[in-house]
């Protein structure tokens, strides 16, 4: 448990560093490098190559020399691996300017609703795929409300259309 907590605490420090440094005028590569260095500074290593990008729509994109811009969102996906190989892995998206635009906030609230629904639905005996598809239906309904999707929700989810918004699926398998 202590090793898991250590990995989580270091991962938390990595993310807060990204939020502090991820301001307009700084490059993605600079922030990504500093974030990775946090793991080393605590005697750990990164659990996978740090992802830090304004292009969160590109799954697993590497930090580039792109300069962070006001009004954009930055995605940070990082984690630490302890000497005994326990890992953390968290993804956070935050506004480079420090404040969400109205549309960004609306979408952030949808993600928050999906997160909360997943927590509420996840119980012993409930299948992962049942939770996954329930969240996908909520997500697709909310995207329709925001004018970002249209059509019958059940049919869209059955056809995989929700993956435009959730390409990775709901979490990682353990």
State where each predicted segment sits:
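Active-site neighborhoods and metal-handling regions in enzymes and metal-associated proteins
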Residues: 1-174
